């Protein structure tokens, strides 16, 4: 089924910029700023922000841009990311071409030739633990996508390079926004003391977290539901493969929750109403 063409991709709600050579503290500030701007001001879970819901049956219209600069003076690579679910859907190369990861989604864009899921990018989500992350990997990813041209699309090696670059950015920007565990791990790799180590790979628990953002968000939101009179609140259901056994651990793992409707909890309509009433756009 063809994607519904998105609106406002060129009118981002905000733009967050990060210089690849900046400090780990600057990186932490960059990620925290994205979470703060994306949150529904009227919805928190265990003091963690929650995204406003994905509006049903309408084309995506809430976007933000991330500009990643290989050096302070460079123009930078622009990423187009959905503000309702933090999906990376496009990037703009130095020749002004917008490349899209979902065919037909971004007006005027060129399909990159592969999708944005880890299955599309890696062949198997288990391979996430093989992806090296670090400052050099981030710089290489930015350079590869910023320098992409339409002549690269028929080239197998160039397509593979682009897949690897998108995977790196997904982990170091999108997943880092979703998870405090991932952003903390990446910040550690960018720390001056990490010079000898230079790069690192996520472990199995973090891989399970990345693959289970919706499940972990839902599990925490279920504990917020007001119980019937005389009943105690729902206990957090441990997710062993993520290393998350309590609601406190879940809150310490998540950077921002995906909105999920859970029995007895906020409906999509109510959450959207609260979001708009609190000034959300």
Curated annotation (Swiss-Prot):
The modification N-acetylalanine is found at residue 2. Pfam families: RIP. GO terms for molecular function: rRNA N-glycosylase activity; toxin activity. The keyword Acetylation applies. InterPro entries: Ribosome-inact_prot_sf, Ribosome_inactivat_1/2, Ribosome_inactivat_prot, Ribosome_inactivat_prot_CS, Ribosome_inactivat_prot_sub1, Ribosome_inactivat_prot_sub2. It catalyses: Endohydrolysis of the N-glycosidic bond at one specific adenosine on the 28S rRNA. It comes from the Eukaryota. Its main location: cytoplasm. The active site is at 175. PROSITE patterns: SHIGA_RICIN. One of its GO terms (cellular component) is cytoplasm. Its EC number is 3.2.2.22. Belongs to the ribosome-inactivating protein family. Type 1 RIP subfamily. PANTHER family: PTHR33453, RRNA N-GLYCOSYLASE. Three similar RIP 30 isoforms I, II, and III have been described in Barley. This is Protein synthesis inhibitor I. It comes from Hordeum vulgare (Barley). The gene is RIP30.
């Amino acid at each position: 089924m063809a994607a519904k063409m998105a609106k406002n991709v060129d009118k981002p709600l905000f733009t967050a910029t990060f210089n690849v050579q900046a400090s780990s503290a600057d990186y932490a500030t960059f990620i925290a700023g994205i979470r703060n701007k994306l949150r529904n001001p009227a919805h928190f879970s265990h003091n963690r922000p929650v995204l406003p819901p994905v509006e049903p049956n309408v084309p995506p219209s809430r976007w933000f841009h991330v500009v990643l600069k290989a050096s302070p003076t460079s123009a930078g690579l622009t990423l187009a990311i959905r503000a309702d679910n933090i999906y990376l859907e496009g990037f703009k190369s130095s020749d002004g071409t917008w490349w899209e990861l979902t065919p037909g989604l971004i007006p005027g864009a060129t399909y990159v030739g592969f999708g944005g899921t880890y299955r599309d990018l890696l062949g198997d989500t288990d391979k996430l633990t093989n992806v090296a992350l670090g400052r050099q990997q981030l710089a290489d990813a930015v350079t590869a996508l910023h320098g992409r041209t339409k002549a690269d699309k028929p080239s197998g090696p160039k397509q593979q390079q682009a897949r690897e670059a998108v995977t790196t950015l997904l982990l170091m920007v999108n997943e880092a926004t979703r998870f405090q565990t991932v952003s903390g791990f990446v910040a550690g790799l960018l720390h001056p003391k990490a010079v000898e180590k230079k790069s690192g790979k996520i472990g199995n628990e973090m891989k399970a977290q990345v693959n289970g953002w919706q499940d972990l968000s839902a599990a925490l939101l279920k504990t917020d539901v007001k119980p019937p009179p005389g009943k105690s609140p729902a206990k957090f259901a441990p997710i062993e493969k993520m290393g998350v056994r309590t609601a406190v651990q879940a809150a310490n793992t998540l950077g921002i929750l995906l909105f999920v409707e859970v029995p007895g909890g906020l409906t999509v309509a109510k959450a959207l109403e609260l979001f708009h009433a609190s000034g959300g756009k």
